[in-house]
């Protein structure tokens, strides 16, 4: 079973800035067609990943996260609605 964690202050600011709660963001990990990418540009102190998929509110989101070594824990760092290019990629239209 996957466990999720996040900083509550960051979750509040993310909701204000992007209109996406981390509760909604975690549902993206259950989209069977979600695509995960390694986020090389932001993986300085830890490996970060981007998950692109549909939430349980039928919104296509991109979720930045890292995976904790202790247990099966995903730490959500940020989440936002996917851009037009990201949407095309998810739909198989883009590069």
Describe the predicted segments one by one.
Residues 1-95:
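Ribonuclease/tRNase effector modules and their secretory precursors
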């Amino acid at each position: 079973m996957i466990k999720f964690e996040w900083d509550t202050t960051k979750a509040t600011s993310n909701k204000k800035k992007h209109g996406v709660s981390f509760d909604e963001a975690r549902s993206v990990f259950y989209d069977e067609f979600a695509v995960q990418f390694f986020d090389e540009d932001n993986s300085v102190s830890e490996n970060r990943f981007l998950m692109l998929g549909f939430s349980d509110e039928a919104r296509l989101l991109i979720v930045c996260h890292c995976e904790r070594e202790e247990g099966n824990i995903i730490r959500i760092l940020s989440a936002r609605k996917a851009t037009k290019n990201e949407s095309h990629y998810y739909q198989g239209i883009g590069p």
